[in-house]
Amino acid sequence: MKKIDKIINFMRILEEVCVVNRDLVLFDGTKENDAMHIFKLSFLVMLIAPYLKTPVNYTKLLELALVHDIAESKTGDYTAANQMANPSLKKEKQKKEQQAIKEILSILPFQLHKKLNKLYQEYEHKQTTEAKIVSVLDKLEANLQANQYKNGDVNYWKNCENGEEYYKIALEKKALV
């Protein structure tokens, strides 16, 4: 198969990210999907990067933001609240996502497969400063999203890691909206 055909096939699979719903309800009552989340995270990276005091590879920041949730096109989204309620779910998530990323990236030409897998693993294992920054921004984007709940309902965050803190922040911001 030609390289371009492999890339087109990969893009078809990537399309599935657009239909993976997250548990976040947007202000209009619809659910956020993974593609929306990745889009907003990528913008957050672009907006925050110029203000970082630590020297970073800006391109890598964006690449990490783009690849960090693509395995969910096969596994779906595992919510933080569900993982908190069921600790074994986190290991199940990691295992399924590793299988999914292997399957998804196998479609690509070797060099692209190798590059995207390296980025994905780097993010998952927080191996670099860039991966750690994107991970923090990923959580920040979710916190910002909490303020967009329909009717300002931010109770979801009470059940997440550091949820009480997120909940307090979200309630304070809700008062400003």
Name the predicted role of every residue range.
Residues 1-177:
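Alpha-helical, largely C-terminal catalytic domains
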